[in-house]
């Protein structure tokens, strides 16, 4: 068996003298006497042992001499000396040996520089005073000569440690210091962890300072991370994740910069499509520093052992190619935590650095394993959250370099490290696929109402970009029209920035739970919420005005415009504000509508074009309110039959046209059962900062809603609904509505509740026990889909998951598609009980994870008020050869409404037809992630995603967007090669299976450039 790297046991000891036989016999005889042996005889002295261990430290200037650590046990003396000679007997060096600790038996230790360029033999003589008391011969092998790249950067929390703007000012000051430091330390590289640091600097410093930073980035003297901020990727929609590097890309385009790397710090895991998105945004390298707080499987073994836990743990660091579903990949370094400069003593001095780095390199299980044959590693980060740079780190780093040739520490950018690794080891590195765990996303459910609004706002932002593609046809072709177009484009860019900032991982103050009424807690949450409030207000106006511009350019007379932002034609219900008693007419046919008590109307919209609109006439109609069907627990409409549980009001039975029961009998009474869980403080739920509590099982109290009343209403021309009043402790008001449709292949569920705020630990779930035994569970994630367990890396989160628009459970040919428009979070099999699963086998039960306050920091301590959570269920089998895109179509329809304009009246006909589309894409297996006017005004940019699972060519034709030329682009609108436009005026894009493709379409009279 080979010894660990750099450590070899010494050869057997040869004592100086042999004790006489007579003395040995006497001692043995004396020890055999019962009385004397027990009470008078001293214990035998332990043998003296000598160990010699090379360290990773090599001396300047040439790195030929290695610092060898000599340890001695069994020596009864206050101090000693070790003389080291080579195989020729020449003295190599002498080490003074001092007690290694205060504990008994701690032994002695000392260090000596030894020439060690190859495996060599040495002799160590142990001396006390002038007497040699022991000798050992050893064979030492040189450890690896390590190169450690130090990614000097400080973590960005937009808040948490202080008010948000103060935190950003800290990072601006750090960049000030980085620029000022270059004159005296030209080889030192500071890095901006994320693009937000750089953007904030340029926007708030003088133009000269901004130019200096841009030049330093251009010259490679300051690192530039491409990720906008440290995002919660699981709560992002498709287009939002596609924009994770968009602010960096836009800044780079405008300033003639490039980038290769991205960082994500603190957030412990990301969705499996992130490498595809980064690769499609020009990023080749990714460095992450996960914080395993409330991500128990990501704890390293040493930390888990310290707090008395057993199980499978995560080894750090990790170095691998992370590959997305489409084959796009990034070279990924995954560190344990961040702030490595403090961890390794850069703030203390070179001696502490040498000791801590040596211990890490010699004892880390990853480094001593055969699976890490490399001699290079990354030190991730400088200090902790929002810290001002400590210049001692730089001084001690440089002093260390003067003393030690190895480990060679290079203060470099992330790409400096990765380029070295790729050049030397790129083809040998392992490839991994799958997500790394969406652990921290559950904290967003501490503000469930805002999370629901955030999901809606992301889709609305995408819709406003689509509507802007008609600007050239609805605005005057003059300076005023151009100015209005630019103003709206600027506002949309700010909307996207606000939406990205709301999806950033900092939700509030460090003391948000311990001091829920504290100044920092209140002020930081108000600031955070303004990102959402501002974006939502601007979106409401942009949507209304965009719809009206198109509507007012269409047919004469009173009308409304209905817009479908999804990639496929839609027939669905829509809510018509102020529409009671009014009817929409398309091609002479009146759409079915039911007048609702709030003055709106529920309308059945039919055949609205993909990425397009219908301009409809509006006229007065015959009143058509819901028809009261009396008390009832049962409804049958279209192909669905629903029966409510008389105790809970949940859906006890759901059958479709085949008569098969879709509800599993057992622990839960039915679908849409509201489950309120309280308790769990100081337990394995990890609800406080003391990790010692993690071994304690939570004591949970589980309550379910109770039925108060149920009535049936007929919606003439549309369907039937059950309106259910329910009671639940902690919820003063609770109403559920289950709607079945005459012609639509799904049922809709809406739960409207009023919640009482409490600081007690709590969670709200909505149970959906589907009648499966061992289903496959596919989940739509941003820009892709994943299969639970199959597409998850070791240590990934199995206790909860995030979906973008749908979850598909299927077994054999049977299947159910579930969507939760208002919450991305769900669990499988059970509610959260602090199990921290390493594996999961789905059993068919799904729980919307609507609310919780389990976090002990950052997220909200309590929530109350009005809250609505909606769900859509459709029966969708998984027959071989079926339409792989159908879950995407139905899931999108569940989450994004058909957009309808305010009423308008046109004096005459406008230039637009009664219906139109932004673009013509016949391929039904393509999702248009986004289509928008280009940031620089040069044409339009379209981003496509394959949802059919096959690589192919996809044709894109003109409609509202007209073009003569096209170029490939990446997701951040950087131009690539030209694409030919065919005689049919269509352009063809190569779309990888499960992948993205983007193009710039140039509109006349612009030329490709």
Report residues per predicted region:
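Alpha-helical scaffolding within the catalytic cores
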Residues: 134-136, 174-177, 204-217, 243-246, ...
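CE4/NodB-like, metal-dependent polysaccharide N-deacetylase domain
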Residues: 241-280, 359-380
């Amino acid at each position: 068996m080979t010894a660990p790297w750099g450590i070899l046991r010494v050869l057997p000891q040869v004592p100086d003298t042999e004790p006489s036989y007579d003395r040995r016999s006497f001692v043995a005889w004396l020890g055999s006497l019962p009385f004397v042996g027990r009470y008078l005889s001293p214990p035998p002295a332990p043998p003296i042992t000598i160990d010699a261990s090379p360290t990773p430290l090599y001396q300047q200037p040439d790195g030929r001499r290695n610092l060898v650590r000599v340890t001695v046990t069994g020596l009864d003396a206050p101090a000693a000396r070790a003389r080291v000679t080579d195989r020729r007997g020449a003295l190599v060096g002498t080490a003074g040996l001092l007690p290694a600790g205060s504990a008994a038996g701690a032994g002695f230790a000392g260090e000596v520089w030894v020439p060690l360029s190859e495996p060599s033999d040495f002799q160590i003589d142990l001396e006390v005073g002038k007497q040699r008391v022991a000798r050992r011969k050893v064979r030492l092998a040189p450890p690896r000569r390590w190169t450690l790249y130090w990614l000097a950067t400080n973590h960005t929390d937009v808040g948490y440690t202080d008010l948000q703007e103060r935190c950003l000012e800290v990072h601006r000051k750090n960049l000030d210091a980085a620029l000022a430091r270059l004159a005296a330390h030209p080889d030192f590289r500071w890095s901006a962890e994320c693009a937000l640091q750089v953007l904030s600097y340029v926007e708030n410093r003088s133009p000269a300072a901004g130019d200096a930073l841009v030049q330093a980035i251009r010259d490679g003297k300051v690192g530039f991370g491409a990720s906008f901020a440290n995002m919660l990727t699981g709560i992002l929609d498709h287009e939002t994740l596609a924009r994770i590097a968009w602010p960096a890309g836009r800044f780079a385009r405008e300033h003639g910069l490039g980038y290769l790397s991205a960082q994500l710090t603190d957030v412990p895991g990301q969705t499996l499509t992130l490498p595809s998105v980064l690769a499609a945004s020009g990023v080749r390298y990714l460095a992450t520093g996960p914080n395993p707080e409330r991500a128990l499987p990501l704890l390293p073994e040493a930390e888990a052992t310290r707090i008395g836990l057993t199980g499978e743990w995560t080894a750090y660091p990790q170095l691998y190619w992370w590959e997305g579903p489409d084959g796009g990949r990034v070279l990924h370094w995954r560190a344990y935590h961040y702030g490595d400069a403090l961890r390794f003593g850069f703030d203390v001095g070179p001696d502490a650095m040498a000791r801590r780095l040596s211990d890490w390199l010699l004892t880390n299980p990853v480094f001593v394993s055969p699976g890490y044959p490399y001699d290079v590693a990354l030190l991730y980060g400088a200090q902790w959250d929002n810290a001002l740079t400590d210049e001692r780190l730089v001084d001690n780093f440089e002093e260390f370099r003067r003393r030690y040739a190895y480990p060679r520490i290079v203060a470099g950018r992330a790409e400096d490290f990765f380029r070295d690794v790729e050049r030397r080891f790129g083809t040998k590195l392992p490839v991994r696929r799958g997500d790394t765990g969406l652990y921290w996303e559950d904290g967003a459910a501490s503000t469930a109402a805002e999370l629901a609004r955030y999901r809606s706002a992301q889709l609305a932002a995408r819709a406003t970009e689509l509507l802007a593609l008609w600007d050239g046809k609805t605005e005057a072709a003059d300076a005023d029209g151009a100015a209005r177009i630019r103003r709206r484009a600027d506002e949309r860019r700010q909307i996207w920035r606000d939406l990205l900032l709301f999806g950033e991982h900092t939700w509030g103050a460090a003391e948000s739970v311990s001091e829920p009424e504290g100044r920092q807690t209140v002020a930081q949450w108000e600031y955070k919420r303004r990102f959402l409030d501002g974006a939502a207000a601007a979106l409401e106006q942009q949507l209304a005005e965009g719809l009206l511009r198109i509507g007012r350019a269409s047919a004469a007379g009173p009308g409304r415009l209905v817009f479908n932002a999804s990639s496929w034609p839609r027939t669905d219900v829509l809510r018509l504000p102020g529409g009671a008693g009014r009817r929409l007419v398309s091609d002479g046919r009146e759409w079915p509508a039911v007048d609702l008590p709030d003055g709106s109307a529920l309308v059945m919209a039919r055949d609205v074009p993909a990425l397009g609109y219908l301009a409809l006439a509006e006229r007065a109609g015959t009143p058509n309110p819901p028809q009261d069907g009396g008390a009832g627990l049962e409804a049958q409409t279209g192909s669905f039959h629903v029966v409510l549980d008389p105790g809970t009001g949940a859906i006890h039975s759901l059958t479709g046209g085949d008569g098969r029961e879709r509800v599993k009998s057992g622990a839960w009474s039915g679908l849409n059962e509201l489950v309120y869980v309280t308790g769990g403080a100081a337990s394995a739920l990890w609800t406080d900062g003391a990790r010692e509590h993690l071994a304690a099982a939570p004591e949970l109290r589980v309550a379910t809603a109770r039925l108060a009343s149920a009535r049936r209403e007929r919606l003439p021309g549309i369907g039937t609904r059950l309106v259910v009043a329910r009671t639940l402790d902690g919820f003063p008001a609770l109403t559920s509505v289950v709607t079945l449709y005459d012609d639509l292949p799904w049922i809709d569920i809406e739960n409207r509740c009023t919640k009482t705020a409490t600081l007690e630990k709590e969670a709200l779930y909505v149970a959906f026990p589907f009648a499966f035994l061992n289903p496959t569970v596919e989940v739509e994630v941003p820009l892709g889909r994943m299969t639970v367990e199959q597409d998850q890396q070791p240590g990934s989160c199995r206790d909860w998951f995030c979906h973008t628009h749908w979850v598909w459970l299927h077994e054999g040919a049977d299947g159910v598609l579930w969507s939760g428009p208002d919450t991305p979070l769900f669990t499988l099999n059970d509610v959260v009980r602090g199990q921290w699963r390493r594996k999961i086998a789905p059993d068919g039960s799904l729980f919307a994870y609507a609310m919780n306050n389990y976090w002990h920091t950052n997220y909200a301590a309590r929530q109350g008020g009005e809250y609505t959570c909606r769900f859509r269920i459709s029966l969708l089998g998984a027959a071989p050869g079926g339409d792989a895109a159908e879950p995407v179509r139905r899931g999108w329809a569940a989450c994004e409404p058909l957009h309808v304009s305010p009423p308008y009246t046109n004096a005459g006909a406008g230039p637009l037809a009664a219906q139109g589309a932004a673009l013509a894409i016949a391929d039904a297996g393509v999702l248009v992630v986004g289509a928008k006017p280009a940031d620089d005004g040069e044409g339009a940019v379209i981003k496509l995603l394959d949802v059919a699972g096959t690589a192919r060519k996809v044709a894109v034709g003109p409609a509202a967007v007209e073009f003569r030329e096209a170029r490939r682009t990446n997701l951040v609108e950087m131009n690539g090669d030209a694409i030919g436009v065919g005689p049919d005026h269509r352009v063809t894009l190569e779309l990888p299976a499960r992948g993205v493709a983007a193009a710039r379409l140039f509109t006349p009279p612009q030329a490709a450039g």
